[in-house]
């Protein structure tokens, strides 16, 4: 008897945004007190961002991840103790170690000894984490995975640099994947090029208990823009090829929510109508690894994304990293 093909399938989604919603005008007013000039019009014209959410000082990345995870588990209707793999994509972990995934496993009360680890690919992190979990499930090593993107980027922003501090926000998004004979994740593609590591980075490091170098995010915006628009179409086409799908078969595109100009450029290059692109950057800002699962959960819960539809996700981030996945929801 032939052995059936094993897939990983999305059972449920969840997300969480901290309650402190900061509009462009509110942020501009805060910055003006330090002599930093910006405006709602300037931010919207260049990014499409109108607001973002910031976590309170006593709230950690694992706290955000916990709420998103609980909502995804509830939507998936699974026993938390059946989750034998947790992967958290984050660049703003609670600690250098232990991993945020291990902290989350404990907060969820999961005591089954399953694997838990973090993935660090910045804004591509969720694409990396999803593809990794898919591989573990397809090879039979794990059956039920919790995959999360969670960030508190407000902690690493220089609020004297208007070119970066207006872009980012905090939040978390999660999915539960489970082994299935029914097709789910159909194809993924991941890439990196470390020669571009300096165009988007946080150059500080811990040396003998002291932070050496800057602890704030640094970005060469023009270089990031040029590289992003160049690689995103290619990696999307590669993932579609692995999934044996044409772009016109994509029901929904969920790009990393970084900049509306990058997003619309990629959508246009793929030949997709703008109406098929999920956009949350206006309300969330750039939440790095959390942006894709946040947008996914929003569109699932408002009824746009329905069972059986094909969803293409793609992201690009510091490293330089980029990746894409195609799945049937």
From Swiss-Prot:
Main location: cytoplasm
Recorded metabolic or biological pathway in which this protein acts: Lipid metabolism; fatty acid biosynthesis
Subcellular location as annotated: Cytoplasm
Keyword Acyltransferase: yes
Chemical reaction(s) catalysed: malonyl-[ACP] + acetyl-CoA + H(+) = 3-oxobutanoyl-[ACP] + CO2 + CoA
Function recorded in the entry: Catalyzes the condensation reaction of fatty acid synthesis by the addition to an acyl acceptor of two carbons from malonyl-ACP. Catalyzes the first condensation reaction which initiates fatty acid synthesis and may therefore play a role in governing the total rate of fatty acid production. Possesses both acetoacetyl-ACP synthase and acetyl transacylase activities. Its substrate specificity determines the biosynthesis of branched-chain and/or straight-chain of fatty acids.
Name used for this protein in its record: Beta-ketoacyl-[acyl-carrier-protein] synthase III
Organism: Burkholderia pseudomallei (strain K96243)
Lineage: Bacteria, Pseudomonadati, Pseudomonadota, Betaproteobacteria, Burkholderiales
């Amino acid at each position: 008897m032939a052995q059936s093909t094993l897939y990983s399938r999305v059972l449920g989604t969840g997300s969480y945004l901290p309650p402190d919603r900061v509009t462009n005008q509110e942020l501009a007013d805060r910055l003006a007190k330090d002599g930093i000039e910006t405006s709602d019009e300037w931010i919207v014209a260049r990014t499409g961002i109108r607001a973002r959410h910031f976590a309170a000082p006593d709230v950690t990345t694992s706290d955000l991840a916990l709420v998103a995870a609980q909502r995804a588990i509830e939507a998936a209707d699974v026993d938390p103790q059946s989750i034998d793999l947790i992967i958290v994509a984050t660049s703003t972990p609670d600690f250098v170690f232990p991993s945020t995934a291990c902290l989350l496993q404990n907060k969820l009360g999961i005591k089954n000894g399953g694997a838990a680890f973090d993935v660090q690919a910045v804004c591509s992190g969720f694409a990396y984490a999803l593809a990794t979990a898919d591989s573990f499930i397809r090879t039979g090593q794990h059956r039920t995975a919790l995959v999360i993107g969670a960030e508190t980027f407000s902690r690493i922003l220089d609020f004297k640099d208007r070119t970066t501090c207006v872009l980012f926000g905090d939040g978390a998004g999660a999915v539960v994947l489970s082994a299935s004979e029914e097709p789910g994740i159909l194809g993924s593609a991941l890439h990196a090029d470390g020669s571009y590591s300096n165009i988007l980075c946080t150059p500080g490091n811990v040396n003998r208990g002291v932070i050496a170098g800057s602890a704030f995010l640094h970005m060469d915006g023009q270089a990031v823009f040029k590289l992003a628009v160049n690689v995103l179409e290619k990696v999307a086409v590669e993932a579609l090829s692995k999934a044996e799908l044409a772009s016109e078969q994509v029901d929904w595109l969920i790009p990393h929510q970084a900049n509306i100009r990058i997003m619309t450029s990629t959508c246009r290059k793929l030949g997709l109508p703008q109406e098929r692109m999920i956009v949350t950057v206006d309300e969330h800002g750039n939440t790095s690894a959390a942006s894709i699962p946040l947008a996914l959960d929003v569109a699932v819960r408002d009824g746009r994304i329905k069972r059986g539809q094909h969803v293409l996700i793609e992201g690009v981030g510091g490293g330089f990293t980029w990746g894409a996945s195609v799945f049937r929801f």
